[in-house]
């Protein structure tokens, strides 16, 4: 092999190696930004990883929204998929369309049995339900009337008190 061919071969090899490294880095970066969706039943069964960012979706349980008396930005509520209920804590301003008996998708991490949300997204009109929530409820044949706070599983303790304790 002469020097010119060797030089071209080396150039091609370095180019391919660089492209392969770039592809691996892009795939890794995309994987790090992926938030997996879990419904309330999957979270209650322990399928959601602890201390890893995930998305949790469901309907806000009526009567579960509680604000701390001395911290108006601290909110606790529960989400349900009509089979299980998961307590959620959130520190921040809730969207204007956030309401009980409406669909939400929250991004955050599991800490024990509580979902600590860093972001809460609410539905944008009365007929909208987040696609992940609608699919989950359809799979469980649970689309229908939204349960009140008395109808969701009372065996699952959501809150110890009606107000947050400091």
Curated annotation (Swiss-Prot):
Q: Which gene encodes it?
A: ccmE
Residue ranges, annotated region (Disordered) = 138-166
Q: Where does heme bind?
A: 124, 128
Q: Name one GO cellular component term.
A: plasma membrane
- What is the similarity comment for this entry? Belongs to the CcmE/CycJ family.
Q: Which superkingdom heads the taxonomic lineage of this protein's source? A: Bacteria
Protein name listed in UniProt: Cytochrome c-type biogenesis protein CcmE
State the function annotated in the UniProt record. Answer: Heme chaperone required for the biogenesis of c-type cytochromes. Transiently binds heme delivered by CcmC and transfers the heme to apo-cytochromes in a process facilitated by CcmF and CcmH.
The record ties this protein, via Pfam families, to: CcmE (PF03100)
Q: Which PANTHER family match?
A: CYTOCHROME C-TYPE BIOGENESIS PROTEIN CCME HOMOLOG, MITOCHONDRIAL
Say where the protein is mainly found.
Answer: membrane
Taxonomic lineage of this organism?
A: Bacteria, Pseudomonadati, Pseudomonadota, Gammaproteobacteria, Moraxellales
């Amino acid at each position: 092999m002469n020097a010119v061919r060797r030089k071209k071969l080396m150039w091609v090899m370095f180019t391919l190696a660089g492209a392969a490294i770039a592809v691996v880095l892009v795939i890794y970066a995309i994987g790090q930004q992926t938030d997996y969706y879990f419904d309330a039943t999957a979270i209650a069964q322990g399928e959601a990883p602890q201390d890893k960012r995930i998305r949790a979706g469901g309907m806000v349980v009526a009567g579960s929204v509680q604000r701390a008396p001395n911290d108006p930005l601290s909110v606790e509520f529960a989400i349900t998929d009509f089979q299980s209920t998961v307590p959620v804590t959130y520190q921040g301003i809730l969207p204007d369309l956030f309401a009980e008996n409406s669909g939400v998708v929250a991004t955050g991490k599991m800490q024990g049995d509580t979902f600590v949300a860093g972001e809460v997204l609410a539905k944008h009109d009365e007929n909208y339900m987040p696609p992940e929530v609608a699919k989950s409820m359809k799979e469980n044949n649970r689309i229908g009337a939204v349960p009140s706070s008395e109808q969701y599983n009372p065996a699952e303790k959501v809150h110890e008190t009606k107000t947050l304790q400091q």
